[in-house]
């Protein structure tokens, strides 16, 4: 394997990235060796291979994972994703990132993640439901409202969560709405949950612009990824006064240096099921979007998009990570060297888990808040977290990512230290 090929393999390993980020934070805060050993590994990793009968009568074996990184600050929390590229290492990294994400915004959860190796577009609605319910049964020994609370992630949604919640409820004989979050409103979901991650990205973006002394109306934005997070981020950033010049989906995107009307883009995509052919815009590739002339770049698609191969070509002076792990350590080092201000994923996209926390609290109380209340509480928590990380950055002379990690790792280490080792 050539040096170039080896580097590409290294940069593609999210678990290596997650551990490297933790190691750096642990070194900065001089974390005790025993705590380093505890926190750099996951607490539980569960792999299952389970059969599902397809519509044509054949049986297919699926592979699924559920990983819990740390539960010393509370029940585990993390999404379930359906994707053909799901791997155990990816799920482990995402579980670790969830631990830090919950800690940096100071909500009482640990980190978890789950996934199934599948392209859900290849399954009928009936097959998708059967697969989901069987997976829920397999992981039912791990999940529950006081143990591990799943949520939607890549290619999963409120319907997926409804099936999981119903499956768990049928097993025990009564409804357990707090066992999952991101549910439809009719069965205990929270107002504002669908928009929460994108709203959090917007809150952090506006706070970062204010810190940098730049007004939203002076800001051109490029958003990679136009799913739930990307589309809502683009819409809310436009409402905040920014000019969105580019958006993209998995196959590519559209660009207009004078700005796109996100309302019209959303209407066009809903009608045509694609961004291709949107009038008044030129088609661009996903990688091309990352290096466009813009002030704010929001990578909101998948991991490992900003690497050593394109980091020097990024023209934005502000990056706000809507996706999980979109930047490799190699790219991070280049951005630090270039003085690019980056708001890390564990802070920038924590809006989703924060409102999931609100949903869990509302379910346990059977008392629900208005969307305005949810949004106000979300803004208060994320604004406080942003300012705490900014203060740590300035006091310790760090970048925002490492400041967020120092904040998060310190909190989790403190809880672990107080609880001690059993037995």
What do these predicted regions represent?
Residues 184, 189-293:
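Glycine-rich phosphate/diphosphate-binding loop of Rossmann-like nucleotide-binding domains
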Residues 13, 17-20, 30, 45, ...:
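Conserved active-site and cofactor/substrate-binding residues in soluble primary-metabolism enzymes
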Residues 93, 149-151, 174-180, 223, ...:
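General beta-strand structural signal in soluble alpha/beta enzymes
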Residues 1-191, 414, 421:
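N-terminal ligand-binding/catalytic initiation module
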Residues 23-31, 96-103, 121, 133-145, ...:
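Generic secondary-structure signature for well-ordered alpha-helical cores
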Residues 5-13, 208-209, 312-423:
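Adenosine-phosphate binding glycine-rich loop
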Residues 252-342:
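Rossmann-like adenosine-cofactor binding region
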